[in-house]
Amino acid sequence: KAQPIGDLFRGDVKRITILSLIVCACSLTAWWAFLFWNQQHFRNLAIDAGLDVKSRERLVSAAFFLVIGVSIPGNFFAGYLAKIFGYSRAIVIMFIGFFASMAFTFFIPRSYIELLYWAPAIGFFSGVFALFTMYLPPLFPTLLRTTGAGFCFNIGRISAAFGTVFFGLFSQVGDFRQALFYASFLFIPAIICAVLLPEPKDLKQ
């Protein structure tokens, strides 16, 4: 039987819940903002470069699948880090890489050709999300594991949906680079909260 949501905000569990919510909300919002606005950014750069409609749509599709494809080895790398350092530290390391690669990619204006080289690094560090399904449930007491992990992750997804639109409003008309750059800073609170979260006993080697 699923436990009441209110139990997540009582006693010692409250701290875990709040930290987990911030980790999920901030990291997922940054990632979803990247997935959505990066495509628009590529499309605009292709228009500025004079590519025809067919060519720029091929470019946008190629860029998207390149990022997603690189995330697969990123998943294995995240698992490798977790095996060596533990899940908590692995998530922190991957978040740092996520922030650095995303901030550096969009810190200055780049051509679509340059972005094809830089954007995959962001996709690689998105492999951190492969750790969430193993890491989040054991943070909570046994009877609250399903409720706690599901609640935090789903609230994170809802936040990501609103956050993606919010960061788009930051951008100047036709310039999504700023929105993507600002979104990268969401990994800073995610990193801080991930540092404060414990390594679950069930996952300790």
Task: Kindly label every feature range from the protein language model.
Residues F185-Q205:
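Multi-pass alpha-helical transporter architecture, strongest
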Residues G74-G86:
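Helix-to-loop junctions at the C-terminal end of transmembrane segments
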Residues D12-P73:
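Extracytoplasmic gate region of multi-pass secondary transporters
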Residues T142-S171:
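A late C-terminal transmembrane helix in Major Facilitator Superfamily
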Residues I96-R110:
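C-terminal ends and interior cores of transmembrane alpha-helices
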Residues I113-G127:
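Hydrophobic core of transmembrane alpha-helices in multi-pass small-molecule transporters
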